[in-house]
Every structure is written in C-alpha cells, then in structure tokens.
Amino acid sequence: EPKEKDGKLTAGLGAGGHWDPKDTKQHGYPWQDDAHLGDLPALTVLHDGTAANPVLAPRIKHLDDVRGHSLMIHAGGDNHSDHPAPL
C-alpha cells in the first residue's frame, strides 16, 4: 500500500527502507560488508524497459533471505553513498 509523505501518497514508500539485517545504517557497494544488504548491483535496462543481463548479489546467499521483502528499482545512477552528490 502507498504511504504518505509531505501530504502526497507515494507507492514506493510502502516498501519500507533498505534491507539492513546487520543494522549498519549505511549505503555502500554490493560487495561491501559494512553496508545494507539491500544495496544491490546496478541493473542495466534498455530503452524499451527490458532488463536481460544477470545481476549478481554476492552477499545474498539464499532466496529465503529476501522472501517477504520488496525489490525497488530506481531510475538513474547510484553513487553508493549516504551523502548523494550529482553523478
């Protein structure tokens, strides 16, 4: 279900925050042990909206670990930082 922020309903907010079972409270690279497990590798999406290249998530060992969680795909790049700057 969507959640409200600043008076506007936003579908993505219903997914919750990054998956962070180790309680690191920081963003990082997918292979970095001291970052959210929810920080995944970049997904290459073509102009027609399809994504066919495999993505490896080296720190996720079992599919059961992510069962019941949402997968959010953001548009644009990622600088893997808690203090984003323009890319």
UniProtKB/Swiss-Prot annotation:
Its EC number is 1.15.1.1. It is an enzyme of class 1 (oxidoreductase). It is found in: Periplasm. Its main location: periplasm. Destroys radicals which are normally produced within the cells and which are toxic to biological systems. The gene is sodC. GO terms for cellular component: periplasmic space. Belongs to the Cu-Zn superoxide dismutase family. Homodimer. This is Superoxide dismutase [Cu-Zn]. Binds 1 copper ion per subunit. Its cofactor is Cu cation; Zn(2+). Cu cation binds at residues 18, 74. It comes from Aggregatibacter actinomycetemcomitans (Actinobacillus actinomycetemcomitans). Keywords: Antioxidant, Copper, Metal-binding, Oxidoreductase, Periplasm, Zinc. GO terms for molecular function: metal ion binding; superoxide dismutase activity. It holds the Pfam family Sod_Cu.
